[in-house]
Amino acid sequence: MALEMRLPKARKPLSESLGRDSKKHLVVPGDTITTDTGFMRGHGTYMGEEKLIASVAGSVERVNKLICVKALKTRYNGEVGDIVVGRITEVQQKRWKVETNSRLDSVLLLSSMNLPGGELRRRSAEDELAMRGFLQEGDLISAEVQAVFSDGAVSLHTRSLKYGKLGQGVLVQVSPSLVKRQKTHFHDLPCGASVILGNNGFIWIYPTPEHKDEDAGGFIANLEPVALSDREVISRLRNCVVLLVTQRMMLFDTSILYCYEASLAHQIKDILKPEVMEEIMLETRQRLLDQEG
């Protein structure tokens, strides 16, 4: 049995070395954003006594004359085209209910998915009876937002071979505000693992497949044993994601890769120790600043 004793370490607050990220205009509910009446009121704001006031805690964003406040911690608000990772919670008539970290359950229609083998035909009664064979409660899927209803509920689709059931890997749940929007959210990292950065804050880390089975239609999960080296890479990436989230840094492929490379000098179990987290975070942040400028 290994016993580890650690003493408190005097260290400067991390906020003293935040660099450019500290210049964000942060507000709390009740703060006055501006007294200029020429601006339009956006999400997270309201007008009071001819002043624009914040109604949520977050960062102020301005687009031309529109001012809104992006909450630091919130549920996922779906937008058409978003990539999400979700968990099947219920099988219903011609549809699945999916948990996507939003206020309401999302919906995946039977007509919005590829049939096994990629067949292009109308869904029949036999397909409806076999729905639980395609996806059942507890299964994880990757999908794209097809539509957003007036009440905020989200409709999903998996009409591409890159979407579908997820096999073996690790799921990390973070705040959706920390996931950076990019052209692609599927990344094969050079360290030997892949990540899906869901816009809804669900991060899926899995071993990079050698080849994709296109005949499966995205609904056959690979359950072969994962090699120890791959499991170690996945565990290290998972701890790196948790580290970045703890330090409120944006999640995208470059930040995760830089954090992974900075953590190679430490054991996986030591990454989340406070003094190690500070060392890795400072190196990661410096590399990102060097890349920007």
UniProtKB/Swiss-Prot annotation:
Coiled coil: none annotated. Non-catalytic component of the RNA exosome complex which has 3'->5' exoribonuclease activity and participates in a multitude of cellular RNA processing and degradation events. In the nucleus, the RNA exosome complex is involved in proper maturation of stable RNA species such as rRNA, snRNA and snoRNA, in the elimination of RNA processing by-products and non-coding 'pervasive' transcripts, such as antisense RNA species and promoter-upstream transcripts (PROMPTs), and of mRNAs with processing defects, thereby limiting or excluding their export to the cytoplasm. Residues 1-20 are annotated as: Disordered. Gene3D superfamilies: 2.40.50.100, Nucleic acid-binding proteins. CDD domains: KH-I_Rrp4_eukar (cd22525), S1_Rrp4 (cd05789). This is Exosome complex component RRP4. Component of the RNA exosome core complex (Exo-9), composed of EXOSC1, EXOSC2, EXOSC3, EXOSC4, EXOSC5, EXOSC6, EXOSC7, EXOSC8 and EXOSC9; within the complex interacts with EXOSC4 and EXOSC7. The catalytically inactive RNA exosome core complex (Exo-9) associates with the catalytic subunit EXOSC10/RRP6. Exo-9 may associate with DIS3 to form the nucleolar exosome complex, or DIS3L to form the cytoplasmic exosome complex. Exo-9 is formed by a hexameric base ring consisting of the heterodimers EXOSC4-EXOSC9, EXOSC5-EXOSC8 and EXOSC6-EXOSC7, and a cap ring consisting of EXOSC1, EXOSC2 and EXOSC3. One of its GO terms (molecular function) is RNA binding. It comes from the Eukaryota. The modification Phosphoserine is found at residue 124. Keywords: Cytoplasm, Exosome, Nucleus, Phosphoprotein, RNA-binding, rRNA processing. One of its GO terms (biological process) is positive regulation of cell growth.
